[in-house]
């Protein structure tokens, strides 16, 4: 794996927002940015992973799009190393393969759409379930000011601190180590707090209230799981909560004030068909913050 951030673009507002977010992420990580456009170059077709159909005026559209994006990002982010490349072939396959060479792959997302209610198109959906590296989905409008806290005047920007990184953590689970490493690293790079949310199910007949014994075990498990990571990242302020029931709606709600939301995602053993848990699916539909899906087996 090379140390780079890769962003896939298609000319949509969502992918342009993803390119800006990816540039800022590359600067945070002190690595180059690689901009890619995936799909066959055809004279009259449609953008391969756009959330809505976008007409292609000619087979040079990909080259023009990549050039314009590279120039625009270089102007806004001087000092950032930027390269661009067209990836031929089936978009989901090409993007998933490209992700193997990156620290993170960034794609645009739509949020809760008016028509379909889906966050992203079929290709991005496939990439999230297939990519072997973390994939970040970014909504249009998720600019730098939305990632940062407002000052006393209600203004946010480069001079104000990042919002918390929010981690949806499933315990016990094989995904814990991978998502914890990604989330703590993201919080440390942003000098931000980390808010960890663990969802658990009480017994159907249990009446759970404050201080009830049923809540002790999940809380203790969460505390013990976080202990070595707190020691490894002493500068990250951590808050943790065990939420009864599915945490999807709660995570989507707290994403309003988050700079990044981190989830685990299981890699599919088969190359076809989506594989995504209900919590991840709900969060991806509703989150206002960029969502990082960290793969695990």
What spans do the regions from the language model cover?
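Conserved N-terminal glycine/acidic-rich loop preference
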Residues: 16, 20, 27, 33-35, ...
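Glycine-rich, Arg-bearing micro-motifs that act as flexible, cationic patches
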Residues: 107-126, 130, 145-147, 260-286
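Short, flexible helix-coil linker/hinge segments at the edges of structured domains or between repeats
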Residues: 77, 142-162
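Short beta-strand elements of ligand-binding domains
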Residues: 108-109, 135-140, 292-295
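Structured core of small recognition/catalytic domains
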Residues: 192-262, 271-275, 279
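Small/aliphatic-rich secondary-structure junction motif
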Residues: 1-53, 160-210, 230-232, 237-238, ...
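Structural beta-alpha unit
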Residues: 1, 14, 72-105, 112, ...
